[in-house]
Design a protein with these regions (language model features):
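Short, compositionally biased "basic patch" segments
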Residues: 70-91, 105-106
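PLD/PLD-like phosphodiesterase catalytic module centered on the HKD motif
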Residues: 1-57, 67-74, 100-303
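Gly-rich Lys/Arg/Thr-decorated short loops/hinges at beta-loop-alpha junctions or inter-strand turns
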Residues: 87-96, 121-123
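Acidic/polar active-site rim loop that often engages polyanionic ligands
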Residues: 59-62
Length: 305
C-alpha cells in the first residue's frame, strides 16, 4: 500500500531496518514486540491484534487487541519476527498459533478435543467469530463435531460455505451474520466450556488463503478477567436481534424476530465503553480531590504547574 511505502521510507531514513515480508506469502498478522533490556535481564511486551495499525479503519472497524508481558508469548513473537527476517515461517509454537505452519492443525485438534468430550457425554462447546469461512478441512471437522453433539455458535459476517441446521449433519451448528454501522472485523476462537475453555483472538479468518497462504497470528488469552470479558462480548453478539441475521438450512439469511427486547450489539458496546470512560474520569477526579484534601490537612499548598 502507498501509505506503507511512505512510512517504510521514513523509517529507513531514520536508521530502522525494514523487512518487507516473505516471497509468496502475505504478512497479515498484527504483531508488535517491544524488548526491554535491564540489569534484571530481558523483558518482552507483546501486542497482538485482530486489526490493522490504521488510524482510518480504527474508527470504522471493530477489533480486539491484547497486550501482555508474558515472557513465553514474547519469546515466540521474537522467534516469529526472527524467521520472517530470514524469509522463513515459524514451525512449532506452544502458545501462539502462527500460519501457515501452525494454525490450521491446532484449530482442528481443539475441535477434535471437543468431539472427544461430547463422545464421553460431557459438555462441549465451540464459539467462533470470523469474517469468512471457506476452509474445507476446518468445516469438515466442525460438521464432525456437530454430529458428535458439540454445540457450535458462529458469527460469520461475510462469506460462509457451511450450511447450518441440516438434520443429521449440522443441526448443532448455529450461524449468524452481524452487519452494522461498524465493520465487524475481530476474530475470536473459543474451545470448551467456561470451566476449561481456550480462548484466542486472531488476525486469521477460516479461509485457506489465511490458514495456509499467509502469515497470521492467533494469541491465547490467559487472564481470567479478559476471558470473561470476551465471553460476555460473544454472548451479546449471540443475543443481537437488530443487526444480526441468522443463517437457514436453505442458504437464506433471516431477520431475527424472537420477541425479546431489541438489542443492537454495537450500540451496547459503545454504551459500555462510555460508562467505563466516565468511571475512569470520576475516579481521576476523586483522586485529585483526595490529593488536594491531603495537602490542605497537612497545611500545604497544591500548585498547578
Amino acid at each position: 500500500e502507498e501509505n506503507n511505502i511512505s512510512w517504510s521510507r521514513q523509517l529507513e531514513e531514520a536508521g530502522c531496518l525494514v523487512v518487507y515480508g516473505i516471497d509468496g506469502l502475505k504478512v497479515h498478522s498484527k504483531l508488535c514486540l517491544i524488548t526491554v533490556k535491564s540489569d534484571d535481564g530481558i523483558q518482552y511486551i507483546t501486542q497482538i491484534g485482530t486489526g490493522n495499525y490504521n488510524e482510518k479503519t480504527a474508527r470504522l472497524y471493530t477489533d480486539l487487541s491484547l497486550m501482555t508481558a508474558n515472557y513465553e508469548i514474547g519469546d515466540e513473537a521474537r522467534k516469529t519476527f526472527q524467521e520472517i527476517l530470514i524469509g522463513n515461517t515459524i514451525d512449532r509454537t506452544q502458545h501462539l498459533l502462527v500460519a501457515p505452519n501452525s494454525l490450521q492443525q491446532p484449530v482442528i485438534d481443539m475441535i477434535e478435543d471437543e468431539i472427544e468430550y461430547a463422545k464421553k457425554g460431557e459438555q462441549s462447546y465451540i464459539g467462533i467469530k470470523v469474517n469468512s469461512l471457506t476452509d474445507k478441512k476446518i468445516m469438515d471437522k466442525l460438521v464432525e463435531a456437530s454430529k458428535a453433539g458439540v454445540h457450535i455458535d458462529m458469527v460469520v459476517r461475510g462469506i460462509c460455505c457451511l450450511i447450518p441446521g441440516v438434520e443429521g449433519e449440522t443441526e448443532n451448528i448455529h450461524i449468524r451474520s452481524i452487519v452494522g454501522r461498524y465493520l465487524e472485523h475481530s476474530r475470536i476462537y473459543i474451545f470448551g466450556t467456561k470451566e476449561r475453555d481456550k480462548i484466542y483472538i486472531s488476525s486469521a479468518d477460516f479461509m485457506t488463503r489465511n490458514t495456509l497462504r499467509r502469515v497470521e497470528v492467533a494469541a491465547p488469552v490467559y487472564d481470567e478477567r479478559l476471558k470473561e470479558r470476551i465471553r460476555n462480548m460473544f454472548s451479546i453478539m449471540l443475543k443481537d436481534n437488530v443487526l444480526a441475521r441468522t443463517a437457514l438450512p436453505d442458504g437464506r439469511y433471516e431477520i431475527i424476530d424472537d420477541g425479546k427486547k431489541k438489542l443492537n450489539s454495537q450500540e451496547y458496546f459503545i454504551e459500555e465503553a462510555y460508562k467505563q470512560k466516565i468511571q475512569k474520569l470520576k475516579y481521576g477526579e476523586l483522586r485529585k480531590n483526595m490529593v488536594l484534601l491531603q495537602y490542605q490537612f497537612s497545611g500545604g499548598f497544591l500548585w498547578k504547574q
